[in-house]
Amino acid sequence: MLETILTTIYVYFASPLGLVELFGTIFSAICVYLAIKHNMWTWFFGALGVILFGYLFLQFGLYSDAGLQILFYLPMQLVGFFMWRRAAAKAETKSVVLALTLAQFALICFGIVGAAGVNGYLIATYTTGASFPYIDALTTWMSIAAQLLMIAKYRESWILWVAMDVIAIPVYYVKGMVVVSGLYVVFLVLATMGGIAWYRDYAEQNPNDTTEPGPGGEA
């Protein structure tokens, strides 16, 4: 049994797509870990993972995810690098973490659902071979919002990452992308750790803020 499993893993990762998935997984995991630490190298490893996963998603018919990787994530790695570098140059201590109000966060969530509904309908209506168009669109727009919030250093970005990971894990598993599904389990753990770390950083930077931790960190 063990020999069969090991043989299957070896054969999979020896294939071209298997290698793409493996290295994309490694680079992406490093990217998330460095983001938790406010390390600007996160954007370099993020760019490597984006390129590999963009290609991989195209092969599996996940067109929204592929477009997200190449048309949004890739340029955002450059934007994120320069914004974090500029913020680091201005900050005298640890990178400043910001917080949204409850109303702001709720508005963003409503916007995500609305955009995903329209996007999913267009994919389902005008494309062929798309897998899980509405769920694919939802994770796409959640990722876009989370990425923008992360670039701007809002702690709520991690809430969206956690929610997106929870949705993505079964989708990729059903699609047969077992390693990617496993990667998102790791991402889920890292995103949870990231949220805890950034909320703690915010509390340390704002000791007079007595609001309860959560999406509405500021009143």
Regions found by a protein language model. Name each.
Residues 24-31, 48-54, 141-146, 162-170:
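Hydrophobic, membrane-inserted alpha-helices
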